[in-house]
Amino acid sequence: MKPNAASPQLVATHADAQADRSTMCFPLETASLTGRVSLALRARSLGLLLLILANGATAIAPQAPSTTATRLSMSITLDGKLDEPAWRDAQSFTLTQQAPSPGQPTPYVTEVRVLVGTDAIYFGFKCHDPRPSSVAIHSMRRDGDQSGDDTVSIVLDTYGDHRTGYFFQINAAGARVDGLIDDPQNISLDWDGIWDARTAKTEDGWSAEIVIPSRTLSFARGLDQWGLNVQRFIARGGRTWLRWSSPTLDSFLYDLSRAGVLVGMGALEQGKGIELIPYATGKSTRFYGVSPRSWLASEGGDLTWKITPQLVSVFTVNTDFAETEVDARQINLTRFPLFFPEKRSFFLEGANQYTFGLGLGQQFIPFFSRNIGLLDGAQIPLDAGVKLNGRAGKWNLAFLDVQTRETVVPLQVVQDLGLASNVVPGTNLLASRVSYDVNDNLRIGSIVAHGDPEALRQNTLGGFDAVWRTSKFRGDKNLLIAGWTATTQGDVPPGDKLGWGFRVDYPNDLVACQINMNQYGNGFQPLLGFLPRPGTRQTDVGCAYQPRPSKDGPFGWIRQEFFENEYTRVTDPRGILESWEYFMAPVNVRLESGDRFEFNWDPHGETVLAPFEVAPGVIIPVGDYTFTRWRAEAQTSGHRPLQFGTTTWFGQFYNGHLTQQENYLKWTSPKGKIQIELNTENDFAHMPEGNFVQRLWQVQAAYAWNPNLILTSFIQYDTESQNLGTNTRLRWTIKPGNDLFVVWNRGWQRLLTRPDLSLVPQTDLVAVKLRWTFRF
């Protein structure tokens, strides 16, 4: 599996191939391998794609299953036991194995029941297990990593559009994960809704109760039939998935076109649709050697108003992000900026509405909210803002307008960005996204982003995109085709101000192929977006063949194999080569035990047009470079209390050699109350321009009294900055929607001028934040 710079969202919701695949792979040519195999590979790749398209006869889809939510006439005590008479009288349905052997019986019988009142939906699960003591639990954190946990998941299509919806998941301890669905292959886990869950152990497994208040959801008023799918994941024994609707290897849980039908939702009420969330924050800050400790108290709030049952507006005043987790540090050995994900809840909620094109990933993000309120790591306060998210008929709408405050930034920011002053003026920043569902397969849309986070230039981006997708290609296969174009205007560099691209994606279990091309003009500069390589044309073609050996054969100990190829080529808009990479995974297997190992061959070509510093004091000179790197990787199964993984990159690096060693060790107590994880990266380079060693160490620890009261700590140190940082956070969810946060951030700097290389304190911040939700 080709590494992805982004941290994956670890939620066990797919079959093995779907869960493990970060990028589809498909070789085309290997440029300077040097072009001798390019025509043959191109012909084979395009031939395979044409063969897939040519055989796209559509078969009749199987009838979607249906169930009726039983009307609730009594109260439910949320304890996970399902002992009220209402549960006994409710209609039930069971789940079918989806992977690894679709349709085959399993001992993990799962019964599901649905109750509906006027203001909430209740889901009840009875999860039978022949070995109840082996049920896996590793996390109690909200939106934590549940990839190695036994879980149950729910997806709801509350609009009946077969595209957008909600995702809810709990593990056997009742820890919650939720998100918004806007793509049948992916989900945004950034949304945090107000809902609750409890679990209980039973003699033959475990049971769970989930309650989702109607005011948490947006839905079409009076719509009696919703889309529903339910899934259970068993982590041990090589991992097993059970599903209600479309239990096939090529189906994604998030694909709402494959969901079943939930009847009886027409009487659900939303109330007045008003939600008030005031918050108060107290902060104590000290910069050692610069300023004495300061104290600051502030207050603010959010007001949410559902203009219609499907369209929500949010007004925010004096927005505060005191509870936000710190970034995980990265080592950058490239000449391009690194990507750090957005973590602030105000911007995360509804962020999926701004998804543009298909498969652009970190290559190009037209609107990247992290550019708002953050300038080279320095915080820029927000005075006020307004958001609009939702639907109106077949229209999908998103709007964001934020006013920042004039701020004095640290001298380091001035130097890094080349600012004329340390005073950054307040400015207005705006983004808007509108899309239209032409039919069940085709969506067209537009996007606008306006403003400059530095408040120095005029900048506007405008773009259009179209995405066509089906889950019925060649009967039951997935096929996606997309295209986009955008332009920027204002104070931008000279040259072509246009960007464009297209993608064809065939993401399925046995064969997964894609072709992707995007071009960004020299004058294409979205200041509110993320574009690490402007002035380039980027082509990516890949294919993966992913067989599942017969359990009765000589390779029955292998769950699935992944034979991957991917070729990436980057040129300037005129076609002059800048870089290429050919990634091959001749060995990549997941075992029946859940363990996996992989070996890769990864030749590169780089044209360096300007010298760049790869490490302090080590400059890569101008020139053409061809080098080959190799990777060996092994990981133990995520269901075990003790997990270990190691990755080693080795081989040539420009005109020298580089070995990169990454390891992680993770331990969880039997009930998931204590979790400790150690991550390390050690890079050893031998270059004509100079040798260097870079190290990054990270320790994460968590103690959970229960899923609503959790203490976490994140410790990081890297040798480039010589800085040790800690982030300690206590989160107490008094009840869903009402939270108390206590955060302590502290930094130490290693002084190389001292003989003992001792660490001295640099920064200290303590923050307490209380937020409360009132619903009307």
Show the residue positions of the predicted features.
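Cationic, low-complexity basic patches in intrinsically disordered or flexible, solvent-exposed regions
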Residues: 3, 10
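Short hydrophobic alpha-helical segments enriched in small aliphatic residues
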Residues: 5, 15-17
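Bacterial N-terminal signal peptides
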Residues: 43-56
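Structural preference for beta-rich elements and adjacent junctions enriched in aromatics
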Residues: 59-437, 445-446, 456
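Extended, hydrophobic alpha-helical segments in both membrane/secreted and soluble proteins
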Residues: 278, 297-303, 311, 317, ...
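Exposed, low-structure sequence patches enriched in small/polar residues
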Residues: 381, 472, 476-479, 483-776
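Beta-propeller domains
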Residues: 406, 415-502, 519
